[in-house]
Amino acid sequence: MCTRKYFLSKKATIVAGVDEVGCGSLVGAVVASAVLMLYPDQEQLFSGLIDSKALSNKKRLRFCNYIQKYSLHWSIGMVNVTEIDQLNIFQARLLSIKRAICNLSMIPDLVLIDGKHAPSLNKNILYQCFVKGDSRIPVISAASIIAKVTRDQAMMMLHTQYPKYGFHRNKGYATVFHLKQLDLYGPTIYHRKTFAPVKYMLSMC
């Protein structure tokens, strides 16, 4: 657990939490967010936050506005569909995290990353990975919320271009409805060609 003692041992005054969303989607970018906070503020301001996936859309948006207002800085890192297909989803995830960290306005004393793996970072950047960190560490929860809201908004915009696929609801994930529409109409240019259902569909053309 990421306790007060842990932060003090790292002499971490300014911390950043990082999380990403969209790895399992068939459509669109992988989006990561990094949120920069003073360590004491992380506990005081963000202690009630939970993983973005456990929140309603309304609460998630309200928390997102709150985080953007009270954090020292926040950033986004995106990896687009072309890059995902050129790399793989594992490397795309790491790249989105790296871009989010690099887009921060300053180097934190400590970066807290959700999951088991971290990208290669500047040697001056101290980091620690935490499995299920988005539900254990407030500043990572904050990052997960901003990443989720950012990606959901992008998928809503994509829905206006391609309304047949239900992106406003499924956010590009492989729901029964999405797969049915994919079978009827084929993939869009924003579908990930290397992902199994899309790859299979393209092989049938």
Swiss-Prot record:
Q: Which reaction does it catalyse?
A: Endonucleolytic cleavage to 5'-phosphomonoester
Is Nuclease one of the keywords UniProt gives this record? yes
What EC designation does it have? Answer: 3.1.26.4
Q: Where does a divalent metal cation bind?
A: D19, E20, D114
Please name the Pfam families in this protein's record: RNase_HII
**What coarse category fits the chief subcellular location reported for this protein?**
cytoplasm
Location within or outside the cell: Cytoplasm
* GO BP term (any one): mismatch repair
Q: Where is the RNase H type-2 domain?
A: 13-205
Where does the signal peptide begin and end? none
Q: Which GO terms describe its molecular function?
A: manganese ion binding; RNA binding; RNA-DNA hybrid ribonuclease activity
The cross-references to InterPro entries, in alphabetical order and at most eight, read: RNase_HII, RNase_HII/HIII, RNase_HII/HIII_dom, RNaseH-like_sf, RNaseH_sf
Q: Cofactor binding mode, per the note?
A: Manganese or magnesium. Binds 1 divalent metal ion per monomer in the absence of substrate. May bind a second metal ion after substrate binding.
Keywords carried by this UniProt record: Cytoplasm, Endonuclease, Hydrolase, Manganese, Metal-binding, Nuclease
Q: Which cofactor does it need?
A: Mn(2+); Mg(2+)
The EC class name is hydrolase
- GO cellular component annotations of the record: cytoplasm; ribonuclease H2 complex
- What is the protein's known function? Endonuclease that specifically degrades the RNA of RNA-DNA hybrids.
What HAMAP family does its record include? RNase_HII_B
Entry's family note: Belongs to the RNase HII family.
Name the chain's protein.
Ribonuclease HII
Q: Give the originating organism.
A: Blochmanniella floridana
Give the lineage.
Bacteria, Pseudomonadati, Pseudomonadota, Gammaproteobacteria, Enterobacterales
